[in-house]
């Protein structure tokens, strides 16, 4: 049987259908279509300008590619699994449109540098969109923090009340995490903004190509300077998957807290109906499903990172078919991250904060114990002695069923003559938060300064 593949000259027999289907990637790499056309347009312009092909041939190919791009944008293009991948589908469609001259498009180019170029263009585009969505989420956090500088809530360690803090302080912690995520993706963009086009199969080409020209036409800031490296590594995708894993870990932690906070046990926030669902059997339920889904999707993003690391770990240079497995995880991670960022911004901007419940929660615990120890230390008692005294008072209160602010002054003075009437003000949650004005602390003045720094940072983006 004759082999009609574009690479079929060396073969006497064709692939059987089920084998062909196993090897095909058009079922997912169709997403690279506009980038494949963009890369081909740059390549054919270079071929024409360098005289590698005749000007009229370059013009015919360019016109054909532009028509294919228009058909793609209008949703008219249909792909064939028999053509394996997006590159061979596009070449087949181009040949159908303009005839045999289409075969000159692949001069001085391999599918190896072609697919690498497509993925660099695709990921560069998506990184820009992710950067914008991260910027929006950070703005939402800043707006919410500005509303709640003086909203007092319990701060936790080991999921137990530790010290009272400002709710804004808690939100700004996530702002800082997401800011570092933005920086990581910006570095990722630098490593992605390089053109592999012209590396050919692995060793470059004998044709007098102009790689700087194609890089410039495609909007890349530079080129790969080693042809083997250009076609055989996928570290720019691994970096993206790694950065995405860190980002969705941060999102997952925030989701976990929101899920807890909207429960009856906490009651700190109420999520909008837009981001909640009900139960098919329990009429009273309002479930934080969207937050739970973001938390759950962290697993699939981690999985894509581990999958590609495993694919890459033993690959010899240069191209191997294993690299076909680099795309689906990248595509899915892009979708997951972009949707998760949109959902998280929506959840935060629409939720209701129960300030009173947060404050009351700080008054029904021992999170002011550190304040009492600090109070004694400031009066000259060694902190370790103060810590011991307060620990015993907490034990006493726990057994009796009351809190430190409920202890009468007479009992305090039995414990230490250093304790005076002003101890009760020191034990108030508001006082505890306001006094923590060390750099980076939860004091209101520190938070306002941090908000100003963050606003300047965002405005410079």
From Swiss-Prot:
EC numbers: 4.3.2.1
Gene Ontology biological process terms, A to Z: arginine biosynthetic process via ornithine; L-arginine biosynthetic process
One Gene Ontology MF term: argininosuccinate lyase activity
The keyword Cell inner membrane belongs to this UniProt entry's keyword annotation: no
UniProt-listed Pfam families: ASL_C2 (PF14698), Lyase_1 (PF00206)
HAMAP family for this protein: Arg_succ_lyase
UniProt protein name: Argininosuccinate lyase
Organism: Streptococcus gordonii (strain Challis / ATCC 35105 / BCRC 15272 / CH1 / DL1 / V288)
Underlying gene: argH
